[in-house]
């Protein structure tokens, strides 16, 4: 009920022809690609490498390794192909689009984890086992600039009912 009310009352940004054109181009590029890379194989490699190098318990060394793996996977993603060229109910196209988004999110996650030199919540750096509120009690906003570099901005954490304290088990 709350989601429906929010959707009804929300102020949406206008969808421009430029945005539609970018989306159409991405779809057509995938449908017309004659590359040899298969979406399922790339997705499986992404899943396994993220589990091996960027799951809850991480080190800078493993995260750096994953950065390189992601570069390779993103390069290979440019050479994917799909068999279904249709416009209706094309689940293969949806999976190809989703893989592209997964690669982008993985890149932001790995760079953010590498940048954050502490452990906090589900982000456990074995090479930085302590929480560092002085330097890292903030939200990380990752974004890409035109040259492909991942950059960061930060937003303060608003404390209230729950103050940070050491975990004791």
Annotate each PLM feature.
Residues 1-169:
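Glycine- and aromatic-enriched mobile tails/lids
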């Amino acid at each position: 009920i709350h989601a429906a009310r929010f959707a009804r009352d929300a102020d949406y940004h206008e969808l421009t022809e430029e945005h539609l054109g970018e989306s159409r181009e991405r779809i057509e590029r995938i449908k017309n690609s004659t590359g040899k890379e298969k979406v399922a194989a790339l997705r499986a490699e992404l899943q396994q490498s993220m589990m091996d190098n960027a799951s809850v318990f991480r080190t800078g060394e493993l995260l750096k390794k994953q950065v390189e793996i992601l570069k390779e996977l993103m390069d290979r993603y440019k050479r994917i192909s799909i068999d279904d060229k249709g416009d209706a109910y094309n689940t293969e196209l949806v999976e190809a689009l989703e893989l592209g988004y997964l690669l982008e999110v993985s890149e932001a996650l790995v760079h953010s984890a590498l940048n954050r030199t502490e452990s906090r919540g589900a982000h456990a750096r074995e090479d930085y086992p302590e929480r560092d509120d002085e330097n890292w009690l903030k939200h990380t906003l990752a974004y890409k600039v035109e040259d492909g570099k991942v950059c960061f901005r930060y937003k303060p954490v608003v404390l209230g009912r729950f103050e940070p304290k050491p975990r004791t088990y």
